[in-house]
Amino acid sequence: MRKYLLIHILVISFALLSAPVILAEEEPAITLRSSYSDLSLLSVQSMHNISIRKKDEWGFYGHSTIIHRYEKRSINGDGVVIDHATGLMWHPSGSSDYMRWNNTNNWIRSLNYKGYAGYKDWRLPTLDEAVSLLESSRKNGGPYIDPVFDGEQWGIWTGDIHGSRGVWSVYFSLGNVRWNVKNRYIRPVRSLK
C-alpha cells in the first residue's frame, strides 16, 4: 500500500510540475514585431535580441541572441522551418533568384496564390524577424544562418524601409544588417497565430 501511495504521489507531482513546461512549449518565448515600419539607423542599431559587433553608417554587423527551437517539416509536400521560440514559420529557401524590392510583392502574391504549405498569408519578414535568423558564426563554412535553412540566399529583403533612402536587408554572407536599393533574395515568413 505504501509503495502504491508513493508511486501515486510521484506521478501526480510530475504531472503538476510538468504543466508549466508543457504550456511554455505551446507559446513562443519571444514575440517579434510583425508589421512593417520606416526605421531609422539609430532604431535599428538599438533593436532587442541582438548583439552588435560593429556599427556603421549603413547598419551593423552582429547576430541574434535568441535561442531557437527549429523544426524542419513537410506540409502538403512543401518544406517549412518552424521556429518554436518565435512562433514563426519560414520558407526554408525562398526565391531562387534575386530581385529588386519593388518586384517582391509579385513573388509573394504568387506563393500565396499557390497556397504554399497550405497557407496563403506568406509575407516579407520585418527586420526584427529577419535579423533573428543571424547566427554568431558561419555554419559549416557557409553563411551566418542555421543549416536548417538553404544557404544560397546570401541577402534577403525585409518589408521595412529607411525613409526614401532604401530598404532594410539582412546579409547572411557577411553577418550584417544594412539598408540598400540593390537586388536581394526573398525568404518569406508567416506567423503561426
Language model features by range: what are they?
Residues 1-9:
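Bacterial N-terminal signal peptides that target proteins for export
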Residues 8-18:
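Bacterial N-terminal signal peptides
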Residues 20-123, 127-193:
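Glycine-aromatic-enriched surface loops/turns that form tight recognition elements
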